[in-house]
Amino acid sequence: MSIDTDFLTSVEVKEDELHGNVLIAVTQIALGRTIGVIDKATPNDSNALLILNLIKEADDGEDANICMRQEDRKTFLQTSKIINIGERLLLQRLSEEECDEEDQDDLENLILLKDEDRPDSTQSCTKSSSEDSNLNGFEEYIREHGELVPGQTPPDGSHKCGVCPKSFSSASGLKQHSHIHCSLKPFRCHLCPKSYTQFSNLCRHRRVHSDGWTCPTCQSQMPSQAALTKHRPVCEMTALYKPLMAQLAGLSGAGGLGSVPYWPHILQMATQAPHFPLAFLAANPEAYKLMQQTTCASPDAECSSGHASESSPTTTEPVDLTATPKPPSTSEMETTSKSDDGEDRDSIGDSGNDDDDDSEAGVLDESSTTTSTKKRPTSHTISDILAAPQLGAQALNSTFLGMLQRSLNYNPAVPSPHSFLRAMSGAKASSSPSSSSGSGKDRYTCKFCQKVFPRSANLTRHLRTHTGEQPYKCQYCERSFSISSNLQRHVRNIHNKPNTSLTPHNHHRQRSLHNSTSTSTTTTTVHHPLLHLPGTSVPVPKV
């Protein structure tokens, strides 16, 4: 049997609700084109028979485009008209009388295959006589009774593979197996150029075009479930390192730290914070100058020389920025001493001196007034500064926000200039949508290979594979281990063998090792029972 390979590339298998699996033309097929020849005298390919069996016979009122004609022991199939794209292939059986009425010369040109188109005999598979008889019986059944109805059982003895010696108990098993030997893929997807040898694989592929496999994090379409499983850990790990803007999105109601893009506004906010470190400005004079320029440039800000008289010239004096502890004022000391004296007099008894009580109350009022006037006035809160229009109008600098995420290596004696930012963000960290990384197992990620571990202990042990650290050293030899269990196994199998001879020298060595490791929680040294009995001692020879 031979089948035209160009014809196979011009058709595809589709599922029809009324007719089941049918052949549809994907390219235009010319008139008089020979599709295939079935010859009983030569071995025939069962895969080709299954493909040709998909050509349904035309019903009454339907126009057939494929004609089938039989001559001697050969059956020829050819196109009887031009088949357009999307047209279903329909078969018409011609009797010998109808064939005789036609021009024999034209039929020979349209039906007979050329010698160069016929398959090489060396490519055909050699089969036994029983296989030939079974296959010929299948061909005879198709020729006499027509196509197989879905669910119809072929005749007995026809479920054997024509290429290999395998046999099957059902026609569906033989049909599914036959695609293994066929290099062609008749089941093609109508949305993409992919094709498959089995219809079940095509049905599974159609899920990509219907719902598909979508990543819930980045909404990306994956071609298969395996690709989605491989993509999700990488995508979820990338989501942990989003910019600071996404982490502070929940703070937009209170002014939002996301609207603070540049250093001048950061310094302006910092100076109005209650615990801003003056030592930072003393060590960074350029930052102080930049802060002063920004404060004077803003229309609502008040400069130090703004309240001066217009007639008197403004003079700039150097400001002492050294952070020195402020001594307590005399009024506060007097208030404290007088309050203590008043408590002593009240403990002795009521002396009836109302004037002293009034004088003490007056001193307290004066001291509290003096203390309140000496405090630095704060006219704006941090939330008001963050909500300023000039701060929200500027663009976000992702580089600066990334720098805020990293820990700055400042002197421990000097407080960090960004401590107030961390304090504010920590106050509402629970309201931030990205403050929690989803599940606890995604928090510990290796910085070398990006692996994720559920516990910090697992990550610490994994990091030693990259750094080569071996903190667990053997007490007997010079070997070191990265895992404590490996050290314990080494000591148990190498140094503490059960057949070791017990000598006074070994007793002395084990006792000294026991004293040196008595504070540890895990003891890997094996001791002799005499060392643990009260009142017993092992004689140790003098060296």
Swiss-Prot record:
Disruption phenotype: RNAi-mediated knockdown causes defects in anchor cell (AC) and ventral uterine (VU) precursor cell specification and AC invasion in the larval L3 and L4 stages. RNAi-mediated knockdown on a lin-12 mutant background reverses the AC-deficient phenotype. RNAi-mediated knockdown reduces expression of zmp-1, cdh-3 and him-4 in the AC. RNAi-mediated knockdown reduces expression of fos-1a in the anchor cell (AC) approximately three-fold. RNAi-mediated knockdown causes defects in vulval morphogenesis. Keywords: Developmental protein, Metal-binding, Neurogenesis, Nucleus, Repeat, Transcription, Zinc, Zinc-finger. This is Zinc finger protein egl-43. Residues 2-62 are annotated as: Positive regulatory (PR) domain. SMART domains: ZnF_C2H2. Coiled coil: none annotated. Residues 513-533 have a biased composition (Low complexity). GO terms for molecular function: DNA-binding transcription activator activity, RNA polymerase II-specific; DNA-binding transcription factor activity; RNA polymerase II cis-regulatory region sequence-specific DNA binding; zinc ion binding. GO terms for biological process: negative regulation of transcription by RNA polymerase II; nervous system development; positive regulation of transcription by RNA polymerase II; regulation of cell fate specification; regulation of cell migration; regulation of DNA-templated transcription; regulation of mitotic cell cycle; regulation of neuron differentiation. Its main location: nucleus. It comes from Caenorhabditis elegans.
